[in-house]
Amino acid sequence: MQINQYEIWIADLNPQIGTEAGKTRPVLIVQTNLLNKIPHPSTVVCPITTNVQKDSHILRVHLKKGMANLHENCDVMIDQIRAIDNKRLIKKVGNLPVELIENIKENIAIIIDLE
C-alpha cells in the first residue's frame, strides 16, 4: 500500500477514547513522504469531520463539498493530529487541493508551536 502526504484516506478510528475522533471517516495524511516511502508501520493523520465549525480558523481547515471526492462540506481537524497504525487505513479517496497545503502546514505549526 503506497501512502503519500496530503492524500485523503478512509480510516477506521475505532475504538475511540474520550474526545478522540472515532468512527470510520476520512483522514488527511500529514506525515512526510520521507517516512511514507519506507516500510513504516504507522502514519500521522488529521481526522476529517462533517461537523463544520465556522470560527475555528486555527483548529480546522475547511474543505468544500466535492473537494478530494468528499460528498459533504468538511473540516480537517488540525487539533486532532495523531499517528495511526497503517492497518486502520482502508482506501484512498482523493488528494488535498494544492491551494490548501500551506494553510494545513501553517495551522499544524501553530498547534504544536513550531514558530
Residue positions per predicted region:
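C-terminal terminal-subdomain/extension
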Residues: 1, 66-115
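Compact nucleic-acid interaction/catalytic patches
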Residues: 20-24, 28-65
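Feature marks short, surface-exposed loop/turn motifs that line or immediately flank catalytic pockets
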Residues: 17, 52, 84
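Short, surface-exposed secondary-structure edge patches
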Residues: 1-2, 32
